[in-house]
Regions:
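Short glycine-dipeptide loop
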Residues: 150-156
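Rossmann-like S-adenosyl-L-methionine
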Residues: 125-126, 134, 138-141, 145-148
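Conserved S-adenosyl-L-methionine
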Residues: 2-110, 118-120, 129, 136, ...
Length: 181
């Protein structure tokens, strides 16, 4: 995802200290790092009290990436930007968000993501049992993950191709379901 687009999306969403921020298709963790930078521009992390600093470092940023080499780059990127918390469930997890492992990501105040385009690798369906609609369309599957993992009042900024707006059948059902949330 182009850095300019990431930064614009983060600025529009205005992440705040104390929020849980997630990227279910994290790649090299660009959205998570940009959110951290934005938050630190608003208030220096070293001005936080000890409890808030620990929460920022260990319980704010969550992501998942299923391409192993990309995951390694993302973990290194987070470490280089000081987001190497001590909480094993936080940070960048290696796994497929569209599998049951994706259900382990926390309910979030803010989700920022650019899910991969196309059908799930091998044409298989996501193996999540919490999705209402079975689809091999990755964007529609990620959309279901996103609105299931937002806390009440949560916000999301997502890069999606325009076909998601016009997809018939399952796509229409997912959009209607989203509008009723």
């Amino acid at each position: 995802t182009p850095r300019v687009l990431i930064d614009v999306m983060v600025r529009l969403m205005q992440p705040k200290y104390g929020e849980v921020i997630q990227d279910p298709a994290a790649g090299t963790a660009g959205f998570l790092i940009s959110a951290s930078h934005y938050m630190q521009e608003q208030k220096d992390v070293f001005e936080l009290n000890e409890l808030d600093y620990e929460r920022f470092k260990n319980s704010t940023f969550y992501g998942m990436e299923h391409v192993q080499d990309t995951h390694r780059l993302g973990v290194m990127n987070m470490i280089l930007h000081g987001l190497d918390g001590e909480n094993d469930s936080a940070g960048l997890i290696y796994g497929d968000t569209l599998s049951p492992k994706g259900q382990t990501l926390p309910q979030s105040d803010l989700i920022l993501t650019n899910p991969p385009f196309g059908s799930k690798k091998g044409g298989g369906l996501p193996t999540r049992d919490d999705f209402t609609y079975a689809t091999s369309n990755k964007q529609l599957a990620f959309l279901q993950h996103i609105y299931r993992h937002l806390k009440p009042g949560g916000r999301a900024a997502v890069v999606l191709p325009d076909n998601v707006l016009f997809e018939g059948n399952i796509g229409r059902s997912i959009r209607q379901d989203l509008m009723h949330k």
